[in-house]
Amino acid sequence: MNINEKTRKALLRFQQNEITESLLYAQLAAIEKDPSNKEVLLQIANDEKGHYTILKKYTGQEISPNKLRITKYYWLARILGITFAIKLMEGSEESA
């Protein structure tokens, strides 16, 4: 597939966001005590990983997650709670 450079850069940004959120949701699931919430978080992590895989088909490139963002939201979840961290994360996603 032939895409222009501007589109490719945007897809790479989205791709990095998807893999970052996949890993983050998996980490949040690891600290979640409620089994049903843990299951939901793992499902979201798998969905995000699927989005990453789809985007990778278009970009043809592996991309590393944003480890700083993962660390930031992980510690926000540990200190202020998972719900707060997820709402904050969703807010930053909508403004992007």
What residue ranges belong to the model's regions?
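Non-heme di-metal
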Residues: M1-A96
